[in-house]
């Protein structure tokens, strides 16, 4: 049986891909012409159908300036002289270390709250790591209950520190703690929150591009938060294509596996489908063990080997050669993941997310309106962006198998060990 890898800085802090209309930033694939904190006045147009997950945008023009990083204090505390200063935070313990950053659990000396400090080492010859610039520039404009909050940015000669809200665990570790599949009611609330956050960023012209359980943080009250925006990209970028090395293999859609670099928000929706199945079934949907070929075979075994009739244009993808793949017919998803049949409308929703042809995948907003969520309180669809779903009466997580009702609450924290995490 395949085992999840929940280790790494990714499971502490994670990035996104959204820019509000009034805070668009110039984004380019190389460092040579990127100013993350410069606004652009170019209009970005959204063209999509109500249910189609693939949203395309006009590109904004990009200038030729050198990259700059400027210190920005938390918008929520603009009058406090202590925000934006390194000595405003106390490091408590190291949570993880990667090739260019170290993450610490910390405490704010301003308000006493726990924070996560992502300390990025700056090297004169290389400049600021581009993924860090991208993450900071995107996150500073995002304000949503289901997106990890960037409190502060501290820039010194030696380091760039991103100060995030501290979140106790992630979905990968949560599922490892509760093997065999999660409580169906909890799956529904986690998925609703994931779609809520994705709908927000997609409407803001942003793709996450790296959805996986390690990048979905879960607070001690059960709030799910999108994180790890290092691979996120605003769809106002001038380039029409992106690197296909963007999503962990198990959650990577078949179009990207086949070499497509022309994708949009539909990329994220495949990952949603994989995570949905994994939460219900208790195992990864497509746990490839070898390489891209093996990963595709696992997908086609269940969904059917594509052809021009089921996937227009598939024969023109760089890595598609019909003779390389076993010819499979599509199966009912419950044949592969039997627990989908135990939950009303779960199989139908999963089938509309896990579509090989990208344009057939359900959008985040359309998924929120699926019958799978029909038994949730209507007030959930009326919440403001910054309101938690748990502010609605009678909305709460249920105990997992073997747990008591006191698992979630302010006096409890997850027994998570991140100190051994490695990038």
From Swiss-Prot:
Role noted for this protein: Serine/threonine-protein kinase involved in the control of the eukaryotic cell cycle, whose activity is controlled by an associated cyclin. Acts as a cell-cycle regulator of Wnt signaling pathway during G2/M phase by mediating the phosphorylation of lrp6, leading to the activation of the Wnt signaling pathway.
Source organism of this protein record: Xenopus tropicalis (Western clawed frog)
Name of the protein in question: Cyclin-dependent kinase 14
Residue intervals of the Protein kinase domain: 89-373
Residue positions binding ATP: 95-103, 118
Family: Belongs to the protein kinase superfamily. CMGC Ser/Thr protein kinase family. CDC2/CDKX subfamily.
Active site residues per record: 210 (proton acceptor)
EC number in record: 2.7.11.22
One GO cellular component term: cytoplasmic cyclin-dependent protein kinase holoenzyme complex
Oligomeric and partner information: Interacts with ccny; ccny mediates its recruitment to the plasma membrane and promotes phosphorylation of lrp6.
Gene3D superfamilies membership: Phosphorylase Kinase, domain 1 (3.30.200.20), Transferase(Phosphotransferase) domain 1 (1.10.510.10)
Pfam families tied to this protein: Pkinase
Gene Ontology molecular functions: ATP binding; cyclin-dependent protein serine/threonine kinase activity; protein serine kinase activity
Membrane topology recorded in Swiss-Prot or TrEMBL: Peripheral membrane protein
Location in the cell: Cell membrane
Predominant subcellular localization, coarse grouping: membrane
Domain of life: Eukaryota
Any single GO BP term: Wnt signaling pathway
Recorded catalytic activity of this chain's protein: L-seryl-[protein] + ATP = O-phospho-L-seryl-[protein] + ADP + H(+); L-threonyl-[protein] + ATP = O-phospho-L-threonyl-[protein] + ADP + H(+)
């Amino acid at each position: 049986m395949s085992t999840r890898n929940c280790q790494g800085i990714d499971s502490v802090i994670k990035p996104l891909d959204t820019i509000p209309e009034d805070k668009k930033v110039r984004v380019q694939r190389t460092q040579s012409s990127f100013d993350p904190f410069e606004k652009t006045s170019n209009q970005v147009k959204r063209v999509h159908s109500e249910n189609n997950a693939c949203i395309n945008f006009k590109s904004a023009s990009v200038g030729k300036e050198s990259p700059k990083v400027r210190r920005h204090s938390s918008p929520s505390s603009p009058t406090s002289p202590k925000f934006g200063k390194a000595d405003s935070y106390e490091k408590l313990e190291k949570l993880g270390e990667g090739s260019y950053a170290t993450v610490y659990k910390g405490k704010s000396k301003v308000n006493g709250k726990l924070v996560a400090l992502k300390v990025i080492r700056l090297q004169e010859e290389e400049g600021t790591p581009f993924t860090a610039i991208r993450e900071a520039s995107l996150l500073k404009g995002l304000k949503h209950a289901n997106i990890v909050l960037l409190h502060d940015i501290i820039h010194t000669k030696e380091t760039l520190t991103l100060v995030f809200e501290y979140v106790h665990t992630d979905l990968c570790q949560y599922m490892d703690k509760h093997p065999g599949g999660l409580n169906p009611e909890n799956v529904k609330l986690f998925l609703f929150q994931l779609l809520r956050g994705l709908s927000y960023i997609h409407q803001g012209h942003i793709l996450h591009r790296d959805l996986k359980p390690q990048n979905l943080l879960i607070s001690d009250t059960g709030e799910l938060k999108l994180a790890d925006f290092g691979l996120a990209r605003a769809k106002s970028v001038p380039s029409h294509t992106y690197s296909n090395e963007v999503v962990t293999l198990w959650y990577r859609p078949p179009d990207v596996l086949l070499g497509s670099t022309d994708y949009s928000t539909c990329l994220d929706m495949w990952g949603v489908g994989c995570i949905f199945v994994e939460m219900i079934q208790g195992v990864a949907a497509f746990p490839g063990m070898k390489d891209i070929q093996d990963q595709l075979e696992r997908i086609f075994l269940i969904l059917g080997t594509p052809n021009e009739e089921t996937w227009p244009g598939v024969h023109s993808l760089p890595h598609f050669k019909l003779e390389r793949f076993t010819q499979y017919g599509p199966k009912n998803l419950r044949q592969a993941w039997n627990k989908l049949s135990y939950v009303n409308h779960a199989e139908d929703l999963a089938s509309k997310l896990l579509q090989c042809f990208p344009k057939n995948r359900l959008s985040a907003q359309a998924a929120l309106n699926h019958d799978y969520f029909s038994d949730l309180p209507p007030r959930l669809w009326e919440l403001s962006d910054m309101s938690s779903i748990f502010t609605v009466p009678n909305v709460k997580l249920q105990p997992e198998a073997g747990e008591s009702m006191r698992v979630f609450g302010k006096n409890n924290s997850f027994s998570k060990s991140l100190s051994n995490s490695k990038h």
